[in-house]
Amino acid sequence: MMTLADRQPIVVADAGPLIRLAAAGLLGTLRGLNRQIVLVDRVEDEVAGDLAKPFAADIAKWIDDMGPAVLRAQTAVGIGVATLKARQRTPEEDVILKAALRDSGELALREFLDRWRPTDTASAIVVYEDRKVPPLFLAASYPLTLMTTRTFARIIESWGVNIGAVAALEAIADRYDLKPALIAEIDSDLSEDLRPLPGPYDGK
């Protein structure tokens, strides 16, 4: 059972959680968790690379304000995409970039998983909205807890960090698709084919 006193880093696995937390006014709550937040470069670019997008400026400011509490993880995939975006491209490179942008988040996350390990704790929390994320993390070589944004809000409310977190998130559900409250505890000692995909969160 996770507690507020634990210090598992929180991996934001795709753009969905940050956008929804920003829309709900909950970004500031993350500071109260006193944990490192891990953002892969392609996820950061998706949520804050274009400041004209909804909540991008808010998220970019939050990242800067959090300072070293946010681990901005670089990947070869992210560096390659950034290099292509920054230079004048041939028509062929435009096609390559368009294809890369479609799959780059998943590829960068996979690359990141292959080399990253939690440093101060033995496990990690992974928050996601993209259905492609859980299968990637089933192969992790360290224990972790996979959860959707709805579960995350319920947990931080149960810890007393923000007793209005669930209501704030549910208030934006008519504008932003939210996955149900799902969770899975991944035991790295289990064979990969025995590890469960996220199921309903019962609040325990």
Where are the regions that the model predicts?
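Feature 3881 marks metal-assisted phosphotransfer/nuclease machinery
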Residues: 1-11, 21-22, 27-76, 83-91, ...
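Short beta-strand scaffold positions
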Residues: 13, 127-128
